[in-house]
């Protein structure tokens, strides 16, 4: 496939939707990322994380990286910040910026969606610098679901998809 504007639009849709799916999956399993005293380290907690990670095609990768020692914070860190994981929020936003940059260069125009995507990437870098233990995860995920939807709407406006 040619790497032209059609390719960029396909990839934009892929990564905006992928970020949304990851965010919503983590949000729906949020309570499982906060283990109770009777579940911590048990087979039940491991199976809960495994199911969530498998739904995002992330189980094998994280298990390999952590050598089988998976905890709630490593799951959240991996799915949100790890640039090596194609379904992580960080990876998706990086790809959105890359494809919007290609479109801006091709059409010789700046777009609001590119500014927002860059802002989201910068915010993720700042949040990554914080310890994952210090982030209010539920608020963080909720905010990014809203911002991701806003990004999709602005992309639609910028390129007259509405």
Regions found by a protein language model. Name each.
Residues 1-162:
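Alpha-helical transmembrane segments and their helix-helix packing motifs
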